[in-house]
Amino acid sequence: MKVSDRRKFEKANFDEFESALNNKNDLVHCPSITLFESIPTEVRSFYEDEKSGLIKVVKFRTGAMNRKRSFEKIVISVMVGKNVQKFLTFVEDEPDFQGGPIPSKYLIPKKINLMVYTLFQVHTLKFNRKDYDTLSLFYLNRGYYNELSFPCPGTLSRNSECQAERQLYDAYFH
């Protein structure tokens, strides 16, 4: 890494730089928008290794199945050691989905009653990167989905079950 680039890292207040680069994943999350505005970026492909669960960069020797399952990210490449390269990708501050369930204060919004919470067992959900990407896409298009109505079939129209589903939807996407 060039000295000028290292200074840009310091200027961007990327405090967790050393610990993030010691991560075993090739793709490292970075919450600093300043960093991505000041250092040149590139587009690279990554895949999730089935054996280790780590995110790896697609290389010349990467197998065909892993190439098919790959996804692209805008990254900053960083040489960490001799022949060791990591890639920083911009993400806003977000909860660590690999770390287990979200803390309970985020699980049960005041709008949702205990029956809905128990029925959907929200506290047992664990998210991976694909789940996060799907939810992000849904969140970006929430205006479109907001316009849709949620009619319930038969005589249950607008009864407690539909209201519970709507409350769950509203709590997580508004």
UniProtKB/Swiss-Prot annotation:
Q: Which domain of life is it from?
A: Eukaryota
PANTHER family this protein is in? PTHR31583, PTHR31583:SF2
**UniProt protein name:** Uncharacterized protein YFL064C
